[in-house]
Amino acid sequence: MDKSKRTFLKSKRSFRKRLPPIQSGDRIDYKNMSLISRFISEQGKILSRRVNRLTLKQQRLITIAIKQARILSLLPFLNNEKQFERTESTTRTPSLRARKR
C-alpha cells in the first residue's frame, strides 16, 4: 500500500517569485514613456493583464495613460513599420498548376 501511494506523489518544485512589473516608486503617467512602452506590443497594441501580470487597478491606469499618450501623439496608434519584406511575388503561375496535376 505504501509503495502505490508513493508513486502518485509529485515532487515539490521550488519556484522563484517574479518581481512585479511596476515597482512602488514608479508613477503611471502618460509622460513616463519608458514605463508605458513595456506594456505595448510590437504592433502598438495594449497587452492584456495576463501577459503584463498587473492588478486590475494598475492595468486600468496603464490603459488610460497609453490612450492619453496616443491622443497627444506621444505614441502612435499603429506601428506600420514593415519588418519582413517580400522579395519575390507569390502569385501562382500556370507552370506551378501543371506540376501539381
From Swiss-Prot:
One of the GO biological process terms: translation
GO terms assigned for molecular function: rRNA binding; structural constituent of ribosome
Signal peptide start and end residues: none
Localization (cell): Plastid, Chloroplast
Key words, A-Z: Chloroplast, Plastid, Ribonucleoprotein, Ribosomal protein, RNA-binding, rRNA-binding
Any one cellular-component term (Gene Ontology): ribosome
UniProt-listed Gene3D superfamilies: Ribosomal protein S18
Matches recorded under HAMAP family: Ribosomal_bS18
Family as reported in the entry's similarity comment: Belongs to the bacterial ribosomal protein bS18 family.
Subunit structure: Part of the 30S ribosomal subunit.
Protein name (Swiss-Prot/TrEMBL): Small ribosomal subunit protein bS18c
Organism for this UniProt entry: Helianthus annuus
